[in-house]
Regions:
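Conserved ABC ATPase "signature" region
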Residues: 105-124
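H-loop (His-switch) and adjacent beta-strand-loop-beta switch element
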Residues: 198-214
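ABC ATPase nucleotide-binding domains
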Residues: 214-246
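Conserved ABC ATPase signature
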Residues: 128-132, 136
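Helix-to-loop junction immediately C-terminal to a conserved catalytic motif
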Residues: 51
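Hydrophobic anchor residue at the start of the ABC signature
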Residues: 142-143, 170
């Protein structure tokens, strides 16, 4: 499989303070990579570099000419009083090369319907975005990330605002999407993502790539990504310990 994006010896940061140092990562077609690491370890910085939102200090980035990225950020803000319908929020995710300001064609409207059915909100097509819960809005923003048919989907803590009743369905949907595209999934919940991703990248100043989804305490400790147990109800989850430094 060909690489969609290849990062070589990337160093990046802010105001000349290095957050990532000598990072190497190759994302192939149909990869499903879980990105883990402590707060301040550089996960967000890595995403910014991949999304061209931050120029690295050094290193090179090679992108396949066919690369199309769909991005679901951790926090999506929208004025719930703004008079926009669900279908129009989704259509706003079209790439500028498709002239998103033009009236959408029949095939694009059909795609909206297919995506809404895919996430279980088929009856909300013409609803105002303000009528939706936070979790439902997150699902709509996922559709927005998918409307342009990306071959790389980037998700930053996608279950943050998703309804708990839909969380399991979300991960099943991502498994289906992985048949069509590569996925980068950022999460603090090691136990959850290790059961679904194919490989793991631990980001903590550098990037340590683990070519498997089998994550043990020993692996995380060797990569300087310590974990701790937290309780969600009666179920313990393995998550990364909090680091206060950037």
């Amino acid at each position: 499989m060909k690489p969609l994006i290849h990062l070589e010896n990337i160093s990046a940061g802010y105001d000349k303070n290095i957050v990532l140092n000598n990072v190497n990562l190759k994302v192939l077609e149909n990869d499903f990579i879980g990105i883990i690491g402590p707060n301040g370890g550089g996960k967000t910085t890595l995403l910014k570099v991949i999304l061209n939102l931050l120029l690295p200090y050094s290193g090179s980035i090679t992108k396949d000419p066919t690369l199309k990225i769909g991005y679901l950020p951790q926090i999506n803000s929208i004025d719930k009083q703004f008079p926009i319908m669900v279908k129009d929020v989704i259509l706003s995710g079209r790439f500028s090369t498709n002239r998103w300001w033009k009236k959408p064609g029949k095939h694009q409207l059909t795609k909206v319907d297919e995506l809404l059915e895919f996430i279980g909100l088929e009856h909300s097509r013409n609803s105002s975005i303000g009528e939706l819960s936070g979790g439902q809005m997150q699902r709509v923003f996922l559709c927005r990330a998918l409307i342009s048919n990306p071959n790389l989907l980037i998700l930053d803590e996608p279950n943050t605002y998703v309804d708990k009743s839909f969380e399991a369905n979300l991960y099943n949907l991502l498994g289906e999407l992985n048949d069509q595209m590569a996925i980068l999934l950022v999460s603090h919940d090691v136990g959850t993502i290790s059961s679904m991703v194919k490989t793991i990248a631990c980001v903590n100043g550098g990037l340590h790539y683990h070519p498997s989804n089998k994550i043990t305490n020993e692996v995380l400790q060797s990569y300087n990504c310590p974990i701790e147990l937290v309780s969600h109800g009666h179920v313990p989850h393995r998550v990364l310990k909090h680091h206060d430094h950037e």
